């Protein structure tokens, strides 16, 4: 019978690990394994999950490093002028080819709620970088509708911002001004609010008058 591991289950499992990491008394380490020489013609052995394999791995560790901090991450998409961005759609099954959120040069994260469109209804490129910290959606001059989500602090950027991934977190309290901005956005969110619509069949025979 076909089955999938849902994203919700994955997030729940990660949340459990992070919660355990954040709790007092829990410590996590990254192990550094032994070095092995390989000839160019060798085939890499496929790892298997067995008690013996895990035991051998633990016994051959060269060293371990204690993990100081952890974070959820998502793919990084830098805002770039001339790019078409997708409006968020709850029917997405994965990250779309056109991103629906962006990171600006100021390390602020915005979600796209509506694409800019031309007179024929075709999507246009984004040419105005979103800015500002409003808790409500706003429209830029290119027709795109954005909403500010959060800012990545210097500490989080230093620890978790890479060329391909960025920090993301749902806060329950704030310890600095940037986190306060995110708390304001979270508190202002309205569950079930309609922030956009899509015309799936426009029909024919209409005039503009």
Over which residues does each language-model region extend?
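Feature for peripheral, non-core segments
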Residues: 1-109, 113-209
């Amino acid at each position: 019978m076909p089955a999938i591991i849902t994203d919700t289950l994955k997030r729940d499992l990660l949340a459990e690990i992070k919660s355990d990491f954040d709790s007092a008394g829990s410590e996590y380490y990254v192990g550094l394994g032994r070095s092995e020489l390989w000839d160019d013609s060798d085939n890499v052995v496929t790892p298997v999950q067995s008690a013996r394999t895990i035991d051998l791995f633990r016994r051959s560790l060269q060293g371990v490093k204690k993990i100081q901090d952890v974070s959820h991450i998502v793919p990084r998409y830098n805002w770039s002028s001339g790019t078409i961005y997708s409006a968020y759609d709850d029917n997405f099954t994965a990250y779309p080819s056109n991103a629906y959120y962006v990171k600006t040069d100021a390390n602020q994260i915005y979600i796209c709620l509506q694409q800019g469109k031309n007179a024929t209804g075709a999507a246009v490129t984004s040419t105005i970088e979103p800015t500002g910290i409003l808790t409500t959606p706003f429209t830029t001059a290119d027709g795109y509708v954005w909403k500010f989500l959060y800012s990545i602090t210097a500490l989080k950027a230093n620890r978790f911002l890479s060329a391909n991934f960025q920090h993301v977190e749902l806060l329950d309290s704030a310890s600095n001004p940037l986190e306060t901005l995110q708390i304001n956005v979270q508190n202002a969110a309205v569950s079930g609010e309609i922030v956009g619509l899509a015309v799936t069949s426009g029909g024919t025979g209409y005039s503009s008058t």
